[in-house]
Swiss-Prot record:
SUPFAM superfamilies: P-loop containing nucleoside triphosphate hydrolases (SSF52540). Residues 1-27 form a transit peptide. SMART domains: DYNc. It comes from Chaetomium thermophilum (strain DSM 1495 / CBS 144.50 / IMI 039719). This is Dynamin-like GTPase MGM1, mitochondrial. Residues 170-183 have a biased composition (Gly residues).
Length: 939
């Protein structure tokens, strides 16, 4: 323990005693953590020194306690403290200087690296720009010289010359304006693109970029452009033929892609397209055929895809296309695994050729644990369905597997034993030795007339923090293939006799598809002509050449419905409304009479209590009887205050809605549930809009009658005559109900026995205690319930008969005896209410409905028909109309196909002269040019 700490320890007891006394004002607590050496000890000594000199009370403590402190020597303590206080700032200062020096060193190092990096980038960009500019100048000069030679050697057709001069558009260059320098016609404007654009239309498709040398001759460039154009037209014709629906007799070939799951089939398709868009996964992903149509669209700014069957257009995100394809494939149940329902996808891009491809599920050797056993057979049957002629087979095989075990080649051999329409594609060429790869491509054991093409369609995995740009997939694959195949010129060079590269595959596919389509065009044209003749004949015989479209059918149906509605409006007016409302009020009158006068319910078999005032005694009752006065006043008040306004609006709306439904049943909309619902909802909407206002107006107009009905003598006479018929109808209903009860219990005799037992019990002749579930008197509980109901109906019928006689009697002839004839009075009140209410109904609801309903129907139908193809769906709901529309559509499509074939022939005839004698002959032969006799071969 140092001297400082011992001094502090000696002072502490005295200080503690002083602080604990009454004069103590505060207590100091000191905590020392982590003694780290001299610095901490210096601070502790300083705090001990401050405690010893800070409080004056310590002086008294020294005298009172006689404590001797020997080692409290300031002469030794102060120099050490000063030395340590100087050492601490020096230590921190040294650390600060070191940190500043290190930061400065790192800053200088980063600055030098940035300058070096910037210099490298600057030099690289300058070199690249100079190289690109030099290459562009060389290409432009070479193209210019080649085009000049081509113009001297070949005669340019008129249509091509017009395009090059900017005269190809209709209406241009034919005006008589004074735009020329001398006031004459303005000379034709030259095309900005020039010959280079026309001649290089296929350059991007075949992979010739700005930095590549297009080694094709002008003749080859022209031939390739024509081939692309013809293929585009052929694919358009093929798509039209698919819409015709005659795939068995009228068809053009497509390219069917087959291969095992591990052969790299998806990678080849993505390399051809230039985007990753197919589903990925270790398990089988492709469960439905994918009919892929590639469209070369020079006007497209970005690549995009379309799903015509789903209504998805211009999907520029290919990851979304991949997700959509995955979901469509996963929609197939696991138990089914594969289906022949195709997924149609169209991809537009300026960098792809016009091709028609079909991607099929990959072949498997053994079904998985969660897959059905017949999966292998289903996949084989599905592939066999598509690889039949005239489709072109793209058989994908991996280079690291023996061709003898290639499932794709085995399948193609079954349907194409001579290999005339099969292209072999060998993937993963970089996984085998170059000599072995070249031997596979030049294979003679499994020869194909269209040959083999070796590709490296999948890029090697890239390490590092940055992922490769998938948007430029084709360029990356092309660069990778050139590096690999170029490093082995002996095996894969121009003189090796083998075909390699995705670009070569794209060109071969385009050539083969064009040749196959052209070779089938004659046969297709003849089949189309036969189909068109048959369709025209059926159209004339069945429909008398009457044109029809979905729009015309809807218009005709709507006109017919409107005509029927106008006939209904002219026959349904105020008299009909008053009759309906009076019938509804008659039922309310009967309800009031039954509640106040007629009801004699039989709840059980106990004796009936005696009634002092019976309806049977009403004709002889005192004319000033308060009971009968109160009964009539209560019934009248209940009738006028039951809500006649709402009742009238409801009755009118229900009647109109029912008539609209009847009109729909008779119209052509009866065969169209969705359109019928739209019209019915439109009627309900119009009626509901006016219901509240109409009922409110009726209640206001009927308010005086709630206090004084003010019945006139003529109204009394009409009510007396009308109520007899109402009571007679009620009596007939009671008799019909009694007849139904007789049939339900087994006859009139049985019912009379039960009724007799009930009458005796009600008179007290038979004592029945309670209503036992087992019955009484030998009758079951259900039979006794029927008996009580029959007694009630009998008593009601007797009362109705008496009241009919009373209404016809002299007593009910005048209004002064209204208390003796409540039926007549209430009927007269109901007639007055109906006459007043129908005035508002006719103006506020009926007339408004007749005006608004036709407009509402047109608006709602227009909205419904133009939502999601509703118009076409509406027309095709009628089987007869659907057959009519299908026949017309079929006829129009066949005519369009023949027109496109004729256009294709005219264009090919115009371009044949630029291809030389041999090329012209080949082109005419492929697409059916006119024969030497002047008659076209396929016409």
């Amino acid at each position: 323990m140092s001297a400082q700490l011992r001094a502090a320890a000696a002072i502490t007891p005295a200080a503690r005693r002083v602080i604990s006394g009454p004069a103590a004002v505060r207590r100091f607590h000191h905590y020392h953590h982590l003694p780290t050496g001299g610095i901490q000890r210096v601070e502790i000594a300083a705090r001990g020194l401050r405690r010893s000199v800070q409080f004056p009370a310590l002086a008294n403590a020294y005298h009172n306690n006689a404590v001797i402190v020997r080692n409290a020597s300031f002469t030794r303590l102060l120099p050490k403290l000063a030395l340590k206080f100087i050492r601490v700032p020096a230590l921190f200062g040294g650390m600060m200087l070191g940190a500043v020096g290190w930061v400065q060193y790192q800053a200088i190092k980063v600055s030098n690296s940035a300058q070096e990096f910037y210099g490298n980038i600057k030099a690289t960009v300058a070199d690249t720009a100079f190289s690109v500019w030099s290459s562009a100048v060389d290409i432009a000069e070479q193209t210019k010289r080649g085009w000049e030679n081509t113009k001297n050697q070949f005669e340019i057709p008129e249509w091509l010359d017009r395009i090059m001069k900017g005269e190809g558009l209709a209406g241009e260059g034919s005006g008589s304006g004074e735009g020329g320098p001398n006031g004459g016609p303005e000379p034709p404007r030259q095309s900005r693109a020039g010959a280079a654009t026309v001649a290089g239309a296929s350059a991007t498709v075949y992979g010739y970029g700005a930095s590549d040398n297009d080694d094709r001759t002008p003749e080859e460039i022209m031939r390739d452009d024509n081939m692309m154009f013809i293929t585009k037209k052929m694919i358009e014709i093929r798509n039209l033929l698919q819409k015709v629906g005659q795939g068995s007799t009228v068809t053009l070939p497509s390219i069917v892609v087959i291969g095992s799951q591990s052969s790299g089939k998806s990678s080849v398709l993505e390399a051809i397209v230039g985007h990753e868009f197919l589903p990925k996964g270790s398990n089988m992903i492709t469960r439905r055929p994918i009919e892929l149509t590639l469209v070369n669209d020079p006007e497209a700014k970005v690549d995009y895809g379309e799903f015509p069957d789903l209504g998805l257009a211009r999907v520029t995100d290919f990851s979304l296309i991949q997700k959509t394809l995955t979901e469509l494939n996963q929609s197939v149940p696991e138990s089914e695994c594969v289906t022949d329902d195709p997924i149609r996808l169209t991809i537009h891009s300026p960098n792809i050729p016009d091709l028609s491809l079909i991607d099929l599920p990959g072949y498997i050797q053994v079904a998985g644990e969660n897959q059905p056993r017949e999966l292998k057979r289903k996949i084989t049957e599905l592939c066999d369905k598509y690889i039949r002629g005239p489709n072109i087979i793209l058989a994908i095989s991996a280079a690291d597997t023996d061709l003898a075990n290639s499932t794709a080649l085995q399948a193609s051999r079954r349907v194409d034993p001579r290999g005339e329409r099969t292209i072999g594609v060998i993937t993963k060429m970089d996984l085998v030795e170059p000599e072995k790869g070249a031997a596979i491509l030049s294979d003679r054991q499994y020869p194909l007339k269209l040959g083999y093409v070796g590709v490296i369609s999948k890029l090697p995995p890239q390490s590092g923090l940055f992922r490769r740009d998938t948007g430029n997939l084709l360029a990356s694959i092309n660069r990778n293939e050139k590096n690999y195949f170029g490093s082995h010129p002996t095996e894969f060079g121009p003189d090796s006799g083998v075909s390699t590269g995705v670009m070569t595959l794209r060109k071969k596919l385009l050539q083969v598809l064009e040749q196959q389509m052209s070779s089938k065009l004659n046969e297709t044209t003849e089949a189309i002509q036969r189909e068109l003749e048959e369709t025209t004949y059926q159209f004339k015989v069945q429909y008398n050449e009457q044109p029809m479209s979905a729009e015309s059918y809807l218009a005709a149906s709507l006109d017919d419905f409107k005509h029927q509605f106008h006939e209904f409006a002219s026959s349904f007016g105020r008299p009909q409304l008053q009759t309906l409302l009076k019938d509804a009020l008659d039922q309310k009158v009967l309800d009031q009479l039954a509640a106040r006068y007629w009801n004699r319910p039989i709840e059980d078999l106990s004796p009936a209590p005696r009634e002092p005032d019976n309806i049977i005694d009403l004709p002889k009752a005192d004319p000033d009887s308060p009971y009968w006065h109160r009964q009539l006043d209560t019934a009248c008040s209940g009738l006028t205050r039951l809500g006649v306004g709402r009742l009238a609006a409801t009755v009118a709306a229900s009647a109109i809605q029912q008539h609209v439904e009847k009109l729909l049943d008779k119209s052509s909309f009866a065969k169209h549930p969705s359109a019928r619902k739209v019209i019915s909802d439109a009627a309900a909407t119009v009626l509901a809009d006016r219901s509240y206002a109409t009922s409110d107006g009726i209640e206001i107009s009927l308010k005086p009658y709630k206090f004084d009905p003010d019945i006139q003598p003529n109204e009394w006479a009409q009510g007396r005559e009308h109520v007899v018929g109402v009571l007679q109808a009620e009596l007939e209903q009671c008799q019909a109900a009694m007849k139904a009860l007789e049939n339900s219990v087994g006859g009139r005799k049985k019912l009379k026995e039960v009724m007799s037992f009930v009458d005796k019990a009600r008179k007290g002749e038979i004592i029945v205690e309670g209503d036992h579930p087992s019955g009484a008197g030998g009758f079951s509980a259900a039979l006794l319930a029927r008996g009580r109901e029959a007694v009630f109906l009998r008593d009601r019928a007797d009362i109705l008969s008496l009241r009919i006689q009373a209404a016809k009697s002299r007593q009910c002839k005048t209004l002064t005896n209204k208390y003796y004839c409540p039926e007549v009075f209430l009927d007269a009140v109901a007639t007055k209410l109906a006459q007043t209410a129908v005035l508002f109904l006719n103006v506020e609801m009926l007339n408004d409905f007749y005006v608004r309903f036709p407009r509402e129907v047109e608006a709602k139908l227009h909205e419904h028909m133009h939502a999601g193809g509703g118009l076409e769906k509406f027309a095709r709901e009628d089987p007869k109309v659907r057959r009519h529309l299908d026949l017309i559509r079929r006829k129009e499509l066949l005519e369009t196909v023949l027109g496109k074939i004729e256009e294709l022939h005219r264009i090919s005839s115009g371009t044949a002269g630029t291809l030389g004698l041999r090329g012209a002959g080949d082109l005419k032969k492929r697409i059916g040019a006119p024969s030497s006799s002047g008659r076209r071969s396929f016409f």
